[in-house]
Amino acid sequence: MQHLADGPITGPSAFLFPQIPIPAERPMAQSQPEVLDLPVLPLRDVVVFPHMVIPLFVGRDKSMRALEKAMEADKRILLVAQKSAETDDPAAVDLHTVGTLAQVLQLLKLPDGTIKVLVEGLSRVTVDKVVEQDGALQGQGTEVEASDAREPREVEAIARSLMSLFEQYVKTNRKLPPELLQTLAGIDEPGRLADTIAPHIGVRLADKQRLLEITDIGERLELLVGLVDGEIDVQQLEKRIRGRVKSQMEKSQREYYLNEQMKAIQKELGDLDDVPGELEELARKIAEAGMPKPVETKAKAELNKLKQMSPMSAEAAVVRNYLDWLLGVPWKKRTKVRKDLKVAEDTLDADHYGLDKVKERILEYLAVQSRVKQMKGPILCLVGPPGVGKTSLGQSIAKATNRKFVRMSLGGIRDEAEIRGHRRTYVGSMPGRLVQNLNKVGSKNPLFLLDEIDKMSMDFRGDPSSALLEVLDPEQNNSFNDHYLEVDLDLSEVMFVATSNSLNIPGPLLDRMEVIRIPGYTEDEKLNIAMRYLVPKQIKANGLKPEEIEIGGDAIQDIVRYYTRESGVRNLEREVAKICRKVVKEIALAGPQPAAKKAVAKKGKPKALVTVNAKNLDKYLGVRRFDFGRAEEENEIGLVTGLAWTEVGGELLQVESTLVPGKGNLILTGQLGNVMKESASAALSVVRSRAERLGIDVDFLQKQDVHVHVPDGATPKDGPSAGIAMVTSLVSVLTKVPIRADVAMTGEITLRGRVSAIGGLKEKLLAALRGGIRTVLIPGENRKDLADIPANVTRDLKIVPVKWIDEVLDLALERPLTPKKAGKEKARKTAPRVAVRGKSRSTPGTRVKH
């Protein structure tokens, strides 16, 4: 790459540098010319004259070293032009023999390593010798004295002629400032006048070097007069060309004067584009695009407008860009939607495990599609925690229905124009992302995945969620209007699938979508997903062969329990990938194994080179990061096992109560939220209202305080579903009857002792099963939710729906406190015990809901 001054800053300001005043006239050279031995700075594409101040950019190593040597001495340097600007490493033969002695006025090192230097030409120098010395060019030469063989009157006449011509040149050349003439008026010396004018005329570099080499002032002035006169002739020729073009234009076309001038120049060069051919091509594309009649009319009107414009005008570029976008819309192109339900079902099952509700909805749509010719695409919203496969499910749906897939991330979008586009009046306007993606995919009926639709926001530029109201309304999206296209676009055949982590979506927008909830995966589902999909995927991704590694189901189960705490499977996949990477390293360090030493399993199949199981899992993943809750081993007074759920699943939650001397206060600890505190107050009121029936002293609060504590105090907790657990704990403390350790419970309590419904039942039952609980008491109103509980959970747990707190106490305490009454529901299904044990702790900092 060519360096400047190694090159100059171009333009008039390079020679008139207002920040640095030009020094006064220097005294005449001495009678004996000085013999110079100075660093040499080779120049490319520039000739520096005496009395000229110019900034230069220096980037070559030798040139920068020459400047360093000059700055270390008296700041003088020889500026010599190269014969060829393409020479990167010039030697003596590559330089002219006449240069300029210059003084360095200012030097600045730039961030990119180059140097910007301001120099002033002092005098002409004949360079006799150039050698390389200390990494720089060093030159020996002699200052050249100007000669004047002509009469002073003749020289003065030539100088006046030159000044007159240059004034004419400056007036017709807009690139030169008028202030330059004022500077020249103050110069009396003819030689200096010539050296000041020479850099400002647009002649070849060779002519400027020739001016530098001429020592006779009169001869130099005469050559300069000829060069300036020639430049004036060129300017007059340009003016005649402009006049000829202008005379050929009609009055209505005068506003396109500059564009017509460019056309005339192109015509002279024979380089005019085939504009009529392009217009015919656009007309053909419009006819073949299959546009609706109103759209085709709009396109033809824009094309006619384009024909009347100059091809080089800015407006023509806007119209041409608009037609390109309009023609890019797939007006009639579509893919054939697959109607084979069996193939679609197999495709969905091959990519995702579980998610039966979503798959059922897609198959229903395909079944109806096979009977109805014109059917609007469904608008689904998949709501679930991160990592459960919402986005990848959208890809599988597109694959199953044979639609093209388009993903549009809505996270962080604040501008309505991202959806509807910008109007064409704005510079750089574009269609919205819907139209852009339709053009990109080239299909009228793709699957649009609107990812993270709950992450949109609004600002002064508009509300993008409001713009989506028309897009996601099946009754309106057949005439969607983009601000840029300004024509109706039919989106009714597009299948929209939105994803969201929560229902924090504006109500009108949520109402237009069919919400399908995707809950977190159970432990069994995670195990199946890992063994079927994640392990084979990571084995392949890390360059392993199936016979080189075997990850057992017990290892996957331990990863789920002790190394991840999530609703989805993203971290599970990361841990599997970590194991695969360590196995790859282990195999690489061990080196190739001899064929004779390869073990063979009992069934004759080759045994895996590395086997990962629960016993050696810590070798690959380190110490366990999490523990899961487990049932207490012994029945205790005042300690009851409740159930809670978080964003990453269910948890066992202990509730402890005790009596301490006091004045009847209720003490609550364990980072309880407002709802949970109110639930504790309600529980105490229930106990006091039933005190006599339960055999409790009605005045038990006269000299005692009741302290209720929920362990794991660093974790905030809130919710009403620990109400019956608090009642049971208080009754146990007051009656001294232990609570069964194998019973867990969840339910809200009312002042009348009724057990109300709760949420998160599935997650809570999974936590109970995992923690070794045998019996779970749930509100009777949640009986309907048992249909969504996995079969293995309902089979291995004894789930008892209850309506009143009396039933809870009869089942949870070691011995009943109240006689059994007919009419109370006592449904107790027998079930085998489970042997799943662990430790009860929540993830630190996780807010627990009850």
Swiss-Prot record:
It is found in: Cytoplasm. Transmembrane segments: none annotated. It is an enzyme of class 3 (hydrolase). Residues 841-850 have a biased composition (Polar residues). Residues 634-815 form the Lon proteolytic domain. GO terms for biological process: cellular response to heat; protein quality control for misfolded or incompletely synthesized proteins. PANTHER family: ATP DEPENDENT LON PROTEASE FAMILY MEMBER (PTHR10046). This is Lon protease. It comes from Xanthomonas oryzae pv. oryzae (strain KACC10331 / KXO85). The gene is lon.
